[in-house]
UniProtKB/Swiss-Prot annotation:
The keyword Ubl conjugation does not apply. The lineage of its organism: Eukaryota, Amoebozoa, Evosea, Eumycetozoa, Dictyostelia. GO terms for molecular function: adenine phosphoribosyltransferase activity. Its EC number is 2.4.2.7. This is Probable adenine phosphoribosyltransferase. SUPFAM superfamilies: PRTase-like. It is found in: Cytoplasm. It comes from Dictyostelium discoideum (Social amoeba). The keyword Nucleotide-binding does not apply. Its main location: cytoplasm.
Length: 199
């Protein structure tokens, strides 16, 4: 893809995200600023701008992973557009059957994520190609959620016989002062982090 086209799509996606975002102070707890992107999903054209950008940025992806909850919307929409499988990573107790589990810290507490151990048992993998996985979520804060998701994704890939893979991550926005992007890069030097807008 031509660099000018890429930059054009990136700028349009950034503009649409800025116009859609609302900041709520002291929510869900005092001292926390919550970046709400709900309006993005209410505006077909703005959401489409984001998907257009992702379509060009991640044209070689084989599997999409969506994180509960807004990552489900982003992941499903992108996977459908690209005709790709979409795997869910959910909060503890939401998935049936044997699951891998990872705990993580967030800016206002702790939580746990789970993924089904055999989530990819029906996915067809091309043996000649490195399997490219894209993990999608809305906001990157301290990075704990994404780090736990990367660990779970690695576990489920290996458990389902996929050993040659690379992982990319995409987020609508980040809270820059929390250094989530830097923490991910520090822990995983082989994982890319794509953020449309850093606040």
């Amino acid at each position: 893809m031509q660099e000018s086209k890429y930059q054009e799509l990136q700028k349009q996606a950034e503009k649409s995200v800025k116009e859609s975002m609302t900041l709520f102070q002291d929510w869900p707890n005092k001292g926390v600023g919550f970046q709400d992107i709900s309006n993005l999903f209410l505006c077909y054209d703005k959401f489409s701008d984001v998907l257009d950008y992702y379509e060009h940025r991640f044209s070689d992806v084989d599997l999409v992973v969506g994180l509960e909850a807004r990552g489900f919307i982003l992941g499903t929409a992108f996977a459908q557009r690209m005709k790709l499988p979409m795997m869910m990573i959910r909060k503890k107790g939401k998935l049936p059957g044997p699951c891998f589990r990872e705990s993580y810290k967030k800016e206002y507490g702790t939580d746990e994520f789970e993924v089904q151990e055999k989530a990819l048992s029906k996915v067809v993998v091309k043996p000649s190609k490195k399997y490219h996985v894209l993990i999608m979520d809305d906001i990157l804060a301290p990075g704990g959620t994404m780090a736990a998701s990367i660990e779970l994704t690695k576990k489920v890939l290996i458990n389902n016989g996929i050993k040659d893979f690379k992982i990319s991550t995409s987020l609508i926005s980040s809270i820059k002062v929390l250094n989530g992007k830097e923490k991910i890069y520090e822990k995983y030097n082989d994982v890319s982090v794509d953020i449309i807008i850093e606040m």
